[in-house]
């Protein structure tokens, strides 16, 4: 890495380990992705255990809760990765994967979409809560979604760091002093300083997640189920929407002159769903607080 007067030249290797004597390569993106999921899982389990109370002790132990959430985190990858891949193929791949179907399974060549990963995680939370709720009553669908919303920023931040190391999802040209000149960018123009939009987006997700984590920590039942998910979806969609303005070409929906990117279009349903969920939670809490008249 070399720092110029007006930009930072980034020529760091995309691999943590890449030896000619060994066939195994360790890319930074894969490491960041794995560590992000691991850290988010550990934080989620810790957060769930912080809400464990005397009422829960009557039905299940803290160890049972921890074990169930470990299974949830482990098997979530079977939904996150395929969901991310399918969404990328449908919304960003164009005709390439239809002409080259063998490339669909080559995830190691890149091509994951975060919106698809979120949908995969939501589907897994729905299935998991259906299977486990009778054993551990606290593991409702909204409880799991609130947990994921509270810790997602850790994974999202690490994944965007991986994108940065991989020199992909490159920003638009900038004259700002922290502009980055990537040595081999996946998009954009070579040798031009660009916004480090991966860092903008990743740090924004992390900040949002920190706020949601502290809103949830030992206060889950007071806040009410669904609120954290609602705030998370609204926040994620807004961050993604505005981050797209700093990115180079990434899947224009109609043509090169389209005002919106595919990422912005896909963020709109998340925003609407999060807003509707927030309204539903507000009305539900308002109904609980309203005084009931008794007949005498």
UniProtKB/Swiss-Prot annotation:
Annotated binding of a 1,2-diacyl-sn-glycero-3-phospho-(1'-sn-glycerol), by residue: 160
One GO location term (cellular component): plasma membrane
PROSITE patterns registered for this protein in UniProt: LGT
Any one GO molecular-function label of the UniProt entry: phosphatidylglycerol-prolipoprotein diacylglyceryl transferase activity
Listed transmembrane segments: 28-48, 72-92, 110-130, 139-159, 197-217, 226-246, 263-283
Top-level division of the source organism's lineage: Bacteria
Pfam families in the cross-refs: LGT
Cell compartment(s), UniProt: Cell inner membrane
InterPro entries for the chain: Lgt (IPR001640)
Signal peptide region: none
Annotated EC: 2.5.1.145
Pathway connected to this protein: Protein modification; lipoprotein biosynthesis (diacylglyceryl transfer)
Family designation: Belongs to the Lgt family.
Protein name in the entry: Phosphatidylglycerol--prolipoprotein diacylglyceryl transferase
Protein species of origin: Chlamydia caviae (strain ATCC VR-813 / DSM 19441 / 03DC25 / GPIC)
Lineage: Bacteria, Pseudomonadati, Chlamydiota, Chlamydiia, Chlamydiales
């Amino acid at each position: 890495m070399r720092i110029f007067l007006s930009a930072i030249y980034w020529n760091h290797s995309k691999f943590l380990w890449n030896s000619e004597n060994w066939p195994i390569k360790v890319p930074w993106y894969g490491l960041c992705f794995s560590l992000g999921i691991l850290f988010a899982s550990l934080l989620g389990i810790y957060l769930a255990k912080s809400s464990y109370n005397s009422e829960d002790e009557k039905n299940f132990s803290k160890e049972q809760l921890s074990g169930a959430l470990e299974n949830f985190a482990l098997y979530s990858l079977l939904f996150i990765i395929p969901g991310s891949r399918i969404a990328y193929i449908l919304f960003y791949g164009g005709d390439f994967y239809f002409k080259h179907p063998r490339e669909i399974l080559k995830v190691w060549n890149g091509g994951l979409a975060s919106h698809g990963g979120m949908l995969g995680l939501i589907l897994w939370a729905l299935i998991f809560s259906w299977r486990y709720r009778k054993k551990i009553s606290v593991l409702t669908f909204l409880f799991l979604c609130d947990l994921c919303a509270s810790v997602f920023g850790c994974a999202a931040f690490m994944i965007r760091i991986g994108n940065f190391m991989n020199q992909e999802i490159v920003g638009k040209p900038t004259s700002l002093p922290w502009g980055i000149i990537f040595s081999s960018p996946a998009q954009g123009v070579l040798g031009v300083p660009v916004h480090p939009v991966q860092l903008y987006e990743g740090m924004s997700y992390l900040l949002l997640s920190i706020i949601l984590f502290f809103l949830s920590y030992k206060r889950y039942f007071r806040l009410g189920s669904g609120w954290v998910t609602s705030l998370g979806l609204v926040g994620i969609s807004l961050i993604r929407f505005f981050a797209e303005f700093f990115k180079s070409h990434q899947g224009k929906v109609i043509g090169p002159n389209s005002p919106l990117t595919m990422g912005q279009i896909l963020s709109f349903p998340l925003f609407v769903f999060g807003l509707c969920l927030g309204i539903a939670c507000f009305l539900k809490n308002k109904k609980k607080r309203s005084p009931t008249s008794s007949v005498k």
